[in-house]
Amino acid sequence: MPMSRPDSSVQLLSDYSLRAHNTFGFDVRARVAARIGSPEQFASLARDPRVAGLDALVLGGGSNVVFTRDFDGLVLLDEIRGRALAREDDDAWYVEAGGGENWHAFVEWTLAEGMPGLENLALIPGTVGAAPIQNIGAYGIEMKERFASLRAVELATGEIVEFDAARCAFGYRDSFFKREGRGRFAIVSVTFRLPKVWAPRLGYADVARELAARGIDASRASARDVFDAVVAIRRAKLPDPLELGNAGSFFKNPVIDAHAYAALRAREPDVASYPQPDGRMKLAAGWLIDRCGWKGRALGAAAVHDRQALVLVNRGGASGADVLALARAIQRDVLERFGVELEMEPVCL
């Protein structure tokens, strides 16, 4: 797949503002930053004495990070572009995209090219390269279900390494790259397997309701119909980061065992929950937060969104420390009332 900017030379940018590179809009600065347009540029930095010894952070869309201070290291801005059908067989298309490609634009492109399968993941903020790190998911599907492989540069050596699904060790909003591999690799491209036999994923009531509101019979819904429905739902529920700084869902939906769930339901009969294949129950974190009275509330300029309790927002002038303080107050209240620990989705730095 062709990659943008084949030149391996890298310009370093000192005292670089990251305000435009994180969706909360925090005005923090990086000691050094570099715009990366090719795998070769990532590799060249491994041998560059100008950045030797600096901690490195790869940023795509900045939609999964909370900066609580300036970053005293090297920020690598992933701008590797390109998308193409890499190959196909009788069963599936294998589509490769550069790590710096906008995720939503990539999903829309696959549909335009007649290759459905990612439509439930429409309008998730961020880049293609960030999708495996977080194992993004929405409306009944996770990225790992469509994942084939990825290529990543090991930052210490400049070596390009291939990862299959097993090596990525995907979990719920989790992967190897959020744990042991954190800070060690930069994802340069991802290949997705999109099955040629397609059926809509309509397990979430919101999607079925939106299709019905549009006069579409769910049994006859096309991939584009599902895409449009998901986009409409997300736009109605979630604020645009360009208008109100946020990082999407701030907390993971907690999963508890059957015994803990039975005890919780005895106290809270209407708790919003979803059964899991292993017998455990996934709780709706937004419901827990709302029940604690946090929806629409604020601590200074950091607030809980008034339409979606899972989303924390920067109303203007908030710092990462403000958002983190709000998140911890919410975690404390949910734990005290329900005995359930909420885990943050974004990385806090």
UniProtKB/Swiss-Prot annotation:
An annotated GO cellular component: cytosol
Required cofactor(s): FAD
EC number: 1.3.1.98
Sequence ranges assigned to domain FAD-binding PCMH-type in this UniProt record: 26-197
GO MF assignments: FAD binding; UDP-N-acetylmuramate dehydrogenase activity
Keywords: Cell cycle, Cell division, Cell shape, Cell wall biogenesis/degradation, Cytoplasm, FAD, Flavoprotein, NADP, Oxidoreductase, Peptidoglycan synthesis
Reaction equations catalysed: UDP-N-acetyl-alpha-D-muramate + NADP(+) = UDP-N-acetyl-3-O-(1-carboxyvinyl)-alpha-D-glucosamine + NADPH + H(+)
Pathway: Cell wall biogenesis; peptidoglycan biosynthesis
SUPFAM superfamilies: FAD-binding/transporter-associated domain-like, Uridine diphospho-N-Acetylenolpyruvylglucosamine reductase, MurB, C-terminal domain
Subcellular location per the Swiss-Prot or TrEMBL entry: Cytoplasm
Active site positions: 173, 249, 345
GO biological process, one term: peptidoglycan biosynthetic process
Signal peptide: none
NCBIfam families according to UniProt: murB, PRK00046.1, PRK13903.1
HAMAP family documented for this protein: MurB (MF_00037)
Family: Belongs to the MurB family.
PANTHER family: UDP-N-ACETYLENOLPYRUVOYLGLUCOSAMINE REDUCTASE
Chain's role: Cell wall formation.
Name of the protein in its database record: UDP-N-acetylenolpyruvoylglucosamine reductase
The gene coding this protein: murB
